[in-house]
Structure formats: structure tokens, C-alpha cells
From Swiss-Prot:
Any further remark recorded for this protein: Present with 3950 molecules/cell in log phase SD medium.
Family membership noted in the UniProt record: Belongs to the enoyl-CoA hydratase/isomerase family. Mitochondrion-specific ribosomal protein mS47 subfamily.
InterPro entries: ClpP/crotonase-like_dom_sf, ECH_dom, Enoyl-CoA_hyd/isom_CS, HIBYL-CoA-H
Protein name listed in UniProt: Small ribosomal subunit protein mS47
Pfam families in the cross-refs: ECH_2
Length: 500
């Protein structure tokens, strides 16, 4: 606490703003009220706190929750007294948000109430797009299960806080759906390792792999790692900061202040922590899920089947292939198509494509998918065995296009938010998370020139990313990540590094 108080004074001096460490105003949600609304909106000085409050459903999002958050965020965007937004759960550390309430959607579909299903996804995806283009800082506490719709609430925010309780996944392949909520836009851009052609992004989308908070941080799925017990103090701290220049919470300068405030509460990774993916496993993912070389799921399966490498690599490839065989064949193909399209599109178009896909899968006019049936099997009937897929044929390109495209007979659009912008790259994500392999490659290649003999050492790479870039100076785990990249992707030539 003394360390944090001293840092507050340092930040006050650096940025020229005042902090209030004793007299902050806050309203706390009454979580013991049984009829409390599913989303709570409270005040923490100049911050606004949105608390998901549907614990019995692990905060699974329904239309009411998405709609209320969307409307309130629009009001916060216009408010002169709101500097930033904190998004968290009343159910932590068990869950942040376990996903969208697709069980209810499946019931709508069986009852032919497709308008209700489409409204559900319109509300949810409009919220995702709003968060992705929000002009004030949003800080998300991913303390607990963060899956599906929970990923949609967090992945688009520049400040994504993982904890020791985080369990991150996109498990939609198990219910015959697809990795939605803009995840196929986000993951190709922010994942740090084995992702030069969206390989790790595609792997996570197709396998539904669950990763811990520490792994989520190392992979770039989270921007910071903070112990769960420090989140309340962090919330108070965030409510104390205000932008110094023209009181503009949309300025890049204020985003930097938010980042430095979060950095004060960052926790070390667990002492026994070992990154989930060894170099051999990263090599498998990189080789077998390359978007530029794989046009179909069958290509990926063949790559896994024929993988040549170490014994560890071959075993991992076989493990992945076995896992993929339990997933919905049609969903795998749709997911691949969406990663291909959304990895090169802008955020608004990508989330609209998710909306078209969700609506078409709900209506299922051509009987190409098994979303409703598989969702009922797993989430309503609570069957523990995988759903017995019957739609196993390879879809034609025209069928995939039809599923992921709008229908003239079914007009739909995202709700209009206050930002009225879109972009192909997030403006702040790369500044505050660990660097990607592509960033490290660009630096090494820029510093290396065989004609002039210019070279760069591993030590210089580590120093550049850990000390030279202000927003990443001393960042947790940055040296470990750079070492992984240098060891796996570089070769030593004349006492320097060359990118392979």
C-alpha cells in the first residue's frame, strides 16, 4: 500500500493532476438482494463501474444485459464526469462471463421465434462493436471464467486484466456454433506467438482450448496480470485519476495514465509457472494452421496427420487432430472462413459478418448446421458426451458464402453507437500488451543488414522491448517472451541474430 501511495505522488507530479486517496465517492452494488438486476451500474469517483450480476448463470449474457450496457455506455460516452469505465463481475473469482445465453436462443429457434434470436445477437454484437470503438478507456477484470460472450466483452478493450482465476476459451465448436463476438477479428491482430498468418488465432478458435490467466497474458489475450486480491484497490485507484489537458479522457495521454496506474498493481506470474506451449508445440501450430497455406479444414487435418518433427511435436499434432474430430465439421469450416475474412477486414464489417452468420445458423434454412440441436444436447439436456454430428460433408464455397452473408429477405444491422468510427487495427492494444512476434521480427530485420554487416544481438532485442519503449518499460514477462521468440525464430550469424 505504501508503494502504491508513493507511486500516486509520482504520477501526480509527472502528469500534473490531482489524486484523492481518501475522499473518493463510490456507490457499491447490493449483491445480497435476490431480485437485483442482471447488470449493476455504480460510481467510483470519475470512473463508472459496470458489474455483471447473473451469478446463477455464470453471468451468461442475455438480451436485457446487452441492451442495458449498450444504452448506458452511450450515456457514459457523452458524460463530462465519466473518465473511464470498469467492467467486472459480482461473481468473481468464479466467473467474469461464461458466454452468451445460447441455451435460450436454441429454445427460440425450436419454437421458430427467430426474431427473438436475431434480437439477442443484434444486441450482443452491437455491444461488442461499441466496446471495440469506444473512445474512453475501458478496463475489464477477467477474474474467473471468460468464455464466448465474456471474450467479446474483454478482447476489444485496451486494458484486459487477467488473474490467477482466469479461464479463457472460445468453445463454440462444441455446440455447433462459431467463434463470434468479433473474436476472429481480434485474435489475428493481438495474439503474440505463432501468429504471423493467424495460426494461433485459428488454433484457439477451432480447438476451444482453455488457457489460464498467465497464459492469456503471455499470448496477448490479456494486457496485464493482476492478483485477484488487488482488484478492489485497483478499482479505487482508477477512480482517482483525471486527464490533465482540457479534461479529455479520449486523449492518448490519458490512456497512458490509465496504463501506468494499472502497472502499479501488476502481480508476478506464479513461481511455478511454465508457459503452456513449448517451442515444439508452437512449431506445430505455426506449421499446421497457416492461413496462407490452408484453404480447407481437410488441409489442416492433413498437415496434422503428416507433421514431421520431434516426438513431442508429432504427439501434439495427433492430440490436436483427435480433438478436432470431436468438433462440429460444419462449424470448423465456418470458423475457418470467418478467420480468413475477418483477419483482413475492418471491425464493423467483421462484427456484421458475425451477425449475418449467427442469424443464418439460427434459421438454418438449408439444414447445413446443427447449432440448435447441439446446444440443446449440451446446455439444456446436460449431456456429457459430445453431440453425435450428422452434418459431416465438406461445404461448398457457395454454401459458406451463403452462411456468412446477409440475406435480402432478412434485413438487419448493428445498433448505432456514439463513436461512429471503425478501424482495421485497434488504436491502443499494441501499446499496452506484450509485443507480437511480428513486432519483434520487424525490429530485428530493420537492425540486420548483410550487405553492411549490421547485426543485432539478443541482448539488444530484450533491451529495446523491455526498456526503450516507454509504455512497455519493465513490463511483466516481456523478456521471457522475447527470449521465446528469439530462440524459436532466429538463428545466430556472426555473433548476431538473423530472422529465419
Amino acid at each position: 500500500m505504501l508503494r502504491n501511495t508513493l507511486k500516486c505522488a509520482q504520477l501526480s507530479s509527472k502528469y500534473g493532476f490531482k489524486t484523492t486517496t481518501r475522499t473518493f465517492m463510490t456507490t457499491q452494488p447490493q449483491l445480497n438482494v435476490t431480485d437485483a438486476p442482471p447488470v449493476l451500474f455504480t460510481v467510483q469517483d470519475t470512473a463508472r463501474v459496470i458489474t455483471l450480476n447473473r451469478p446463477k448463470k455464470l453471468n451468461a449474457l442475455n438480451a436485457e444485459m446487452s441492451e442495458s450496457m449498450f444504452k448506458t455506455l452511450n450515456e457514459y460516452a457523452k458524460s463530462d464526469t465519466t473518465n473511464l469505465v470498469i467492467l467486472k463481475s459480482s461473481n468473481r473469482p468464479r466467473s467474469f462471463c461464461a458466454g452468451g445465453d445460447v441455451a435460450t436462443v436454441a429454445i427460440f429457434n425450436f419454437n421458430k421465434e427467430f426474431a427473438k434470436s436475431i434480437k439477442f445477437f443484434t444486441d450482443e454484437y452491437s455491444l461488442n462493436f461499441q466496446i471495440a470503438t469506444y473512445l474512453k478507456p475501458i478496463v475489464t477484470f477477467m477474474d474467473g471464467i471468460t468464455m464466448g460472450g465474456g471474450v467479446g466483452l474483454s478482447i476489444h478493450t485496451p486494458f484486459r486484466i487477467a488473474t490467477e482465476n482466469t479461464k479463457w476459451a472460445m468453445p463454440e465448436m462444441d455446440i455447433g456454433f462459431f467463434p463470434d463476438v468479433g473474436s476472429t477479428f481480434a485474435l489475428p491482430r493481438i495474439v503474440t506467438l505463432a501468429n504471423s498468418n493467424s495460426q494461433m488465432a485459428l488454433y484457439l478458435c477451432l480447438t476451444g482450448e482453455v488457457v489460464t490467466g498467465a497464459d492469456a497474458y503471455m499470448l496477448g489475450l490479456a494486457s496485464h496480470y493482476v492478483s485477484s486480491e488487488n482488484l478492489d484497490a485497483l478499482q479505487k485507484r482508477l477512480g482517482e485519476i483525471s486527464p490533465p489537458f482540457n479534461n479529455d479522457p479520449q486523449s492518448a495521454y490519458f490512456f497512458g495514465m490509465v496504463n501506468e496506474s494499472i502497472d502499479e498493481f501488476v502481480s508476478p506470474l506464479p513461481k511455478d509457472y511454465v508457459f503452456k506451449y513449448s517451442n515444439e508445440k508452437l512449431n506445430v501450430i505455426e506449421a499446421c494452421f497457416n492461413l496462407s497455406k490452408n484453404g480447407t479444414i481437410e488441409d489442416i487435418m492433413n498437415n496434422l496427420r503428416q507433421y514431421e518433427g520431434s516426438a513431442e511435436g508429432k504427439a501434439f499434432a495427433q492430440e490436436i487432430k483427435t480433438k478436432l474430430l470431436t468438433k462440429s465439421p460444419s462449424s470448423l469450416q465456418i470458423a475457418l472462413r470467418l478467420v480468413q475474412e475477418n483477419s483482413r477486414d475492418h471491425i464493423e464489417s467483421a462484427i456484421k459478418r458475425d451477425l449475418y452468420t449467427a442469424a443464418n445458423m439460427c434459421m438454418n434454412q438449408d439444414s447445413l448446421v446443427e447449432f440448435s440441436e447441439a446446444t440443446k444436447h449440451k446446455l439444456i439436456d446436460k449431456q456429457r458426451v459430445p453431440y453425435p454430428w450428422t452434418k459431416k460433408e465438406q461445404l461448398f464455397v457457395s454454401q459458406l458464402t451463403s452462411i456468412t452473408s446477409p440475406k435480402p429477405s432478412l434485413p438487419m444491422s448493428l445498433l448505432r453507437n456514439t463513436s461512429n468510427v471503425t478501424w482495421t487495427q485497434y488504436p491502443y492494444h499494441s501499446k499496452y500488451q506484450l509485443p507480437t512476434e511480428q513486432e519483434i521480427a520487424a525490429y530485428i530485420e530493420k537492425r540486420t543488414n548483410d550487405d553492411t554487416g549490421a547485426k543485432v544481438t539478443e541482448r539488444e532485442v530484450l533491451n529495446h522491448f523491455a526498456n526503450v519503449i516507454p509504455s512497455r518499460r519493465g513490463k511483466l514477462g516481456i523478456q521471457s517472451l522475447c527470449k521465446i521468440v528469439c530462440e524459436r525464430k532466429c538463428e545466430e550469424v556472426n555473433d548476431g541474430l538473423r530472422w529465419k
